[in-house]
Structures are given as C-alpha cells and as structure tokens.
C-alpha cells in the first residue's frame, strides 16, 4: 500500500478471478470492493446526487465522497463527470425499464396502461406531503446543461426517445381499440405526452397543494390524447407495485 500526501491511493489487487480496489472508508477501517462493484456504486451514487440536487452542483469530489471511493478509483472508470453522467443515464434506464415494461404490458388493456402510467408518475416522480421527489433527474439535468456539451445532450436525447417510444406504443394501442376521437400521428402525440408529463412534474414543485396536480395530470392526458368522453376513467390502474427507485 502506498501513501501520498496523507491519503492512501487506490491500489489494484489482481487475483486469478477478480480485480479489487483497496481504499479507506474511515481513517483506520478499510474494505475491499471489486472493480465491478466500485463502478456500480459510482453510477448509483451519481444518480442519487443528481436526483437530489442537479448536474451542475454535483462535482467529482461529491460523488467520490458519497460513494466512499478515491478520485483515483473514479478516474479508473470514467474520464470525466460528463462520461459518468452518460453512463448513469444508461444505468438509470436499466433500473426503470422493468417498471415500464410492467406498466405498459400488453396483458393490460390500453386504458389500463394509461392509468398505469399515471400511477407510475405519481408514485415515482411527483412530490407528496410526506415525501419530496425531485422529478426525473435527467430531464431536469437537460435544462441545466450548456448546449456545448454534445456528449451529455446526446445521452439525454437517447434516454428521452426511449421513454417516448413507450408513449407512442400506447397511442397506437388506444387508437387501434377505438378509444380516440380522431386519427393522429402516434410519434407526434407520444412526444407531446412526454413533454406534458414532464411539464407537470416540474410545475408540481411549485404547488403546495398536490391535489391540483393529481387532478390536472390525468385529465390533461385524456384531453391531449383525445380519448372519447365515455371512456374517461372507465378503467383503473392494474399496476400497483412500488417503483424500483423508491424501494
């Protein structure tokens, strides 16, 4: 083990089966963590900090301190905060994908899928009187990042489009089942759904009375989609799980 400037540097210990990072958790207590575990902890920590604060306010030192790793360990895995952010976007998608697959499962009717989406948004993205939920970390970050950081912007565009694809599929299902007033362009309407939901999520932070948001989000989606009035709230959500990120 080497020591520089009073701080123990990360050391790679190579075995026949696994590489490990060795770093201090406290001054006299040390632990071993595999390279894979270290990487995953950095991704999860970055996601948590960006969600609680914002992209510009969270630095490499903050991430390392919260994750309990050295900067040497950080830069072994990521070239910069921007590269970590891009991979955290992919990590975030892997975390919530199972939730969305369940919300939009074809086992549910199109109207149930719409109600499931509303339920998912309320549980995972909207504040409650007893729990502050800062919305979507990556949508919020997109509003804070300069236009010159193309790598980060491309990661955000890719993540957004992946989510929009679920909305597009829902529009097509509603249309095919005859629930909509008029024929529409699914791609355009799916994108509008995504934008509307995130606008409501942002506005909810200014609302001390969440009951207004609970009324506006469902009704706004039914209006935006052009669902025939006789089908409004005709079915209830069939997805009752807790979102993965809130567990």
Give each language-model segment a name:
Residues 1-37, 230-247:
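N-terminal intrinsically disordered/low-complexity leader segments
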Residues 38-41, 49-83, 87:
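Helix-turn-helix
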Residues 40, 44, 136-139:
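Short alpha-helical elements of helix-turn-helix
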Residues 87, 101-134, 186-193:
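Hydrophobic alpha-helical connector segments
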Residues 90-95:
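Short, basic, alpha-helical segments at the C-terminal edge of helix-turn-helix-like DNA-binding modules
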Residues 112, 116, 149-176, 215:
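Amphipathic alpha-helical packing segments from all-alpha helical-bundle domains
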Residues 113, 128-151:
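Amphipathic alpha-helical segments used for helix-helix packing
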Residues 124-128, 173, 183, 193-211, ...:
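Amphipathic C-terminal alpha-helical segment
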